[in-house]
Amino acid sequence: MLGFGPFELILIVVIIALLFGARKLPELGKGMGRGIKEFKQEMHEPSPPRPQVTDIPSQRLDPVTGAPVSTESTVPASDRRS
């Protein structure tokens, strides 16, 4: 697979130092350490209970406007034929 010897590791460290600068490396290390620590803490903490989802009756939506459409007839009661 990947055989990283001492020469390859030194080369990688030198390239990183050139890209970020020697002064930024401690800050990068601290940031990565904090991120890993927070990630591990979150993995061990139980997640808060999720709220129970209840069935909500679905509404019909107008396909053009996306507004809810009344399920009742739009014809006034006086104009309806029985």
Swiss-Prot record:
InterPro entries: TatA/B/E, TatA/E. Keywords: Cell membrane, Membrane, Protein transport, Translocation, Transmembrane, Transmembrane helix, Transport. Residues 36-47 have a biased composition (Basic and acidic residues). One of its GO terms (cellular component) is TAT protein transport complex. Pfam families: TatA_B_E (PF02416). It comes from the Bacteria. It is a single-pass membrane protein. Its main location: membrane. It is found in: Cell membrane. Residues 36-82 are annotated as: Disordered. The chain crosses the membrane at residues 1-21. Belongs to the TatA/E family. Forms a complex with TatC. Part of the twin-arginine translocation (Tat) system that transports large folded proteins containing a characteristic twin-arginine motif in their signal peptide across membranes. TatA could form the protein-conducting channel of the Tat system. This is Sec-independent protein translocase protein TatA. The gene is tatA.
